[in-house]
Amino acid sequence: MLFMVIERFKNKDPKPIGERFKRSGRMMPDGVTYHASWIDPVEARCFQVMAAEDIDALKGWAARWADLADFEIVPVLSSHQYWAEQELQKNRSG
């Protein structure tokens, strides 16, 4: 399952996150896969696409960073997957 993780850096300061990342890496538990990330320097946010079997694995990972950022974790589908599922539902009901 894919998730969009939105990190909001505490005090709008990404430096502590960067310093910990350099020391300790991403600190991901087994079963969590990092895909890509983008930084919004104006609003001090990071957007990450990650995969996991369920949201609980990601919540455990976010807890390791909670002293430096607030997290919003949103389950997402690719556009292709979403529209394919819509088509399947349409065919089943109709």
Q: Which residues make up each language-model segment?
A:
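Structural motif
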Residues: 32, 66-69
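Conserved catalytic core of Hanks-type protein kinase domains
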Residues: 51-52, 64
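Short, electropositive alpha-helical surface patch
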Residues: 57-65
